[in-house]
């Protein structure tokens, strides 16, 4: 067993990633040595990734009405969460949404659709979207996240230019039945294996804060090492009202940092991404987390709002980090403002800043098939009381707005996404 965290970092840098005993010791460490732990994990992060931060951008191609019963998910079967629900975005709208993220500094676009898994027709849609995005932006990486894949589908995506496939293991094998019964842990492993065999970079991570033990956290990361995930997103549970995990708040900012350090020390050379829920749980310690993680999602998530995209960029630059693919932060911000202004003007000026006139998103069944094209109709989404509507001005200027707060002022309800894909409002990018 190591004596200090620096000793542990020395061992990792010498070629021996943290084992189960060391990982559990990291998770059990006290708050008063947290900065020592972060400093040790930062040494490992900088050995493999220098001071770079990779920016990723999510485009929710199809939202809600999923037939699976994952207990953490606002899009699950039986969810009462008042999220946006719509069927497939048209290709040109998917490309447009992706380009907002690229203008905001992203080098990877993540194309995501709800459902158990795609039909061959759905794979064709995503292939077409990928080709459209890459024709206009050839240096862009595209990651697809469509659920459980059938035979030949990973190969079709790779042929279209998709670079990576995301399918999170989410939790430990021993905990999986506690959060989902409509598919198995092995189903997820098989899809990651299929993606890798087709030449796609495997992206797979976890969700923390779902009632798992420290032992199960380590077990989950051991499983990620076994499937050889290139990129590991760490999501922090967003406990949506209307889901089985509603009201579950188990994490502290310090615990979140310890989890990130544990993952970095167990998987030293893998992209480690702070993902959904980071604003809710890391809170004011978000900037510190970039000394451990080397990747994040820009702006909003699939069904909830993130912090303002410009705040994301400021957090990266103010921490002394370099955005992958971007040489100058000021030039990036200037391009971002020009990009937004051009889109507002194209939509009719100030009166159209919410995006009026964009193709409506269609309603229909989710799962392995979308609704037939001739049956697709716009779905109106009422904004429930207490939930802020998307801002008509520039997206990304405000802050995360949450309704309920505890005595310390911490948000207790995530803000539902009402801008970007599936809406007439400019995205947070």
Short names for language-model regions:
Residues 1-32, 225-429:
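Auxiliary Fe-S-binding modules of radical SAM enzymes
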Residues 77-205, 209-210, 214-227:
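Conserved Radical SAM active-site core
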Residues 15, 41, 70, 111, ...:
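Conserved, mostly hydrophobic/aromatic
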Residues 53-57, 109, 142-144, 165-167, ...:
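Hydrophobic faces of well-ordered beta-strands that scaffold small-molecule active sites
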Residues 42-43, 131, 261, 287:
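Active-site phosphate/pyrophosphate- and oxyanion-stabilizing loops and adjacent acidic/basic residues
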């Amino acid at each position: 067993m190591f004596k200090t965290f620096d000793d542990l970092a020395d061992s990792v840098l010498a070629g021996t990633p943290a084992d189960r005993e060391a990982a559990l010791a990291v998770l059990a460490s006290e708050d008063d040595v947290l900065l020592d732990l972060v400093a040790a994990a930062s040494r490992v992060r900088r050995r493999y990734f220098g001071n770079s931060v990779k920016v990723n951008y999510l485009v929710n191609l199809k939202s809600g009405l999923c037939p699976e019963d994952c207990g953490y998910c606002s899009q699950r079967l039986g969810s009462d969460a008042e999220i946006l629900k719509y069927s497939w975005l048209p290709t040109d709208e998917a490309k447009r949404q992706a380009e907002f993220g690229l203008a905001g500094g992203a080098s990877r676009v993540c194309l995501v659709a709800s459902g158990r898994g795609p039909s061959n027709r759905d794979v064709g849609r995503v292939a077409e979207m990928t080709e459209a995005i890459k024709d206009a932006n050839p240096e862009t990486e595209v990651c697809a996240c469509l659920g459980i894949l059938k035979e030949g589908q990973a190969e079709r995506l790779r042929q279209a230019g998709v670079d990576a496939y995301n399918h999170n293991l989410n939790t430990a094998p021993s905990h999986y039945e506690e959060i989902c019964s409509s598919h198995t842990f092995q189903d997820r492993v098989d899809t990651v294996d299929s993606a890798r065999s087709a030449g796609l970079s495997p992206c797979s991570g976890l969700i923390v804060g779902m009632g798992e033990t420290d032992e199960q956290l380590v077990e989950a990361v051991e499983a990620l090492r076994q499937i050889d995930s290139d990129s590991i997103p760490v999501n922090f549970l967003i406990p949506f009202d209307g889901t089985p995990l509603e009201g579950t708040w188990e994490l502290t900012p310090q615990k979140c940092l310890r989890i990130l350090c544990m993952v970095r020390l167990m998987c030293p050379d893998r992209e480690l991404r702070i993902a959904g829920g980071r604003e809710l749980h890391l809170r004011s310690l978000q900037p510190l987390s970039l000394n451990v993680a080397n990747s994040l999602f820009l702006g909003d998530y699939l069904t909830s709002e993130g912090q303002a995209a410009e705040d994301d960029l400021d957090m990266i630059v103010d921490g002394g980090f370099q955005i992958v693919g971007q040489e100058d932060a000021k030039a990036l911000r200037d391009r971002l403002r020009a990009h937004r202004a051009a889109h507002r003007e194209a939509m009719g000026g100030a009166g159209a800043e919410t995006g009026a006139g964009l193709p409506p998103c269609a309603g229909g069944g989710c799962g392995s098939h979308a609704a037939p094209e001739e049956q697709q109709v716009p779905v109106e989404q009422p904004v429930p009381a207490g939930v802020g509507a998307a801002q008509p001005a520039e997206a990304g200027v405000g802050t995360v707005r949450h309704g309920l707060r505890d005595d310390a002022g911490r948000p207790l309800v995530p803000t539902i996404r009402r801008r970007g894909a599936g809406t007439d409002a400019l995205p947070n990018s």
